[in-house]
Amino acid sequence: LADDVTFGVAPATIVFSQLYVMEYPSFLESLRPVLPYAAFIIAAFSALRLAKFNLDERQSTSFIGVPTPANALFWGSLIVFNPEWLTVHSWSVFIILALILITSYLLVCELPLFALKFKQWSFKGNEVKYVFIAFTVIVLALAIVSEGAIGFLQAWWLIILVYVLTSLFL
């Protein structure tokens, strides 16, 4: 339950708050009172993921579906630390709603995702992990140099996106 509150309800509440205050296209104004509640799909699917995969023994060297902490980090980084893109365009609401559906699906789908678990430290057999770690360090360093500490927090949504896309093509 604590994991669902931390990694499901908390990001859902963040997304709810953003959907509540953001601009809507005029034809969606009548849905303004109800659309923010779509954010709680994140909490429901996070709970479902935790129930489905918590005792799954197939995840010893990789993950199946996006882990809830990664999903929470994605949403926190995207919404809390990158709010300016959400206020520029009224169509941003569509991006948020689409991302709610996509990320919720990725939580529970049977997609294998590499884990940063090492059985041995040699490069051979761990190439993807080491390249991903190098990518993460470079992105975070560039973000810190360009934006300072806030850049560190802003960059995580991109890192999570690359993590999922990399796993898709392995």
Question: Which residue stretches match the model-derived regions?
Answer:
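Multi-pass membrane catalytic core of lipid/isoprenoid biosynthesis enzymes
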Residues: 1-51
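Short, functionally important structural connectors and interaction interfaces within domains
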Residues: 42-45, 55-58, 100-106
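N-terminal signal-anchor transmembrane alpha-helix
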Residues: 37-39, 59, 72
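Generic hydrophobic alpha-helical membrane-segment signal
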Residues: 27, 34-40, 53, 92, ...
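C-terminal membrane-associated helical module and adjoining short loops/tails
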Residues: 61-170
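Contiguous mid-protein beta-loop-alpha structural module that forms a pocket-lining wall or clamp
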Residues: 49-55, 62
